[in-house]
Amino acid sequence: MAKSPALQNTQISDRANQRNAVAAGFLGWTLDAFDFFVLTFVLVPVAREFHVSLVEMAATITASLAMRPVGAFFFGLLADRYGRRWPLMLDIVFFSIVEVLSGLAPNYKVFFVLRLLYGIGMGGEWGVGASLAMESVSPKWRGILSGLLQEGYAFGNLLAAVVYSLVFPHWGWRAMFFVGGLPALLSLFIFAKVKETEAWHESRTDWSTYGKAIARHWKLFLYMVLLMTTMNSISHGTQDLYPTLLQRQRHFSPETTAMITMISMVGAIAGGLLFGLYSDRRGRRRAMVTAVTFALLLIPAWVLSSTVLLIIPAAFLMQFMVQGAWGVIPVHLNELSPGELRGFFPGFAYQLGVLFASSITLIEAVLARHLTYAQSLGLLAGLVLLIGVPVIGLGPEAKGVAFGKAERGRQ
């Protein structure tokens, strides 16, 4: 039987909204990451202009990271009470304005306060954007789209590198932050093209019931925080000091180090997409455990290779596996979360994981004073990857769970 024109139009509209919601979530996270990485490229010139040390500039990055749970808490609550669209638009406009103001900062103190505020905006985007995207798409496509969404972080890093090469040599560091204000335009796209999710309409509740739901699911939330602490330790433990290993221990030039890093980011993007797709077929935990196990097996080649020809495939495959596991995170956390808490639980757990795992890089650096960088990274990365296998494998899973009315009462 042929479909009626009205039904066909509805299906076309639904598919368009799904694409737009995923695009909004992906672009929001990409541009949020871009705004964050802008500072990492211009630490030296900003420090020079404000007459402060690089340690003091690094403190502004730490300040941003420390405030991310605050943003996840605030915007997550708003997203569960008032819908996903408006809090996401508010958050994007907020961190875009703060980014522009950072480019206008007259001194270090003002700049530091602005980076604190930026951390609130950065912390709020992921959870709200992920819930909007995951609630808008068909369950059979959640995995691969989760991989796309999560790898917006790698895209943001690459985008910051491109903008740095084009903007900084001509207009300086302040112009970099002015470019960082452009994400505000994404809010217009969300306003015009993205609908509020049906799952939110069907799951929304009053504040009293909302508080009881949080209390009822506290064990699940603690598990999600443990999972995200482990996953952030794996990510930062295999990324942050690897360029330092390449430069200080392998004696590679900054250009060669940058080239290897960019190739590894391509691996990250590919891994996120492919393991996200694999999770649609074989399950979330199985996909993540597979990726983490292969990453564990890659450690010897990753830290002991000494030539560019050997390091490139090792770095590519390591980030392919690590970020492959990460590609499953948006869908896994959103499926685990009860509908009435989906704006709050994933984002707040994610950002608390960032906070609790923030010492992994420092521990690696301290350990490298007594060992080599290769030994330090190999030991710490191996440890957190090994811990990751049971944390992921023995945890709960809710692959393909229905969102909205169908999930009410799920414990």
Task: Name these PLM-found stretches.
Residues 114-151:
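Cytoplasmic helix-loop-helix junction between adjacent transmembrane helices
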Residues 279-329:
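C-terminal transmembrane helical hairpin of 12-TM major facilitator-type secondary transporters
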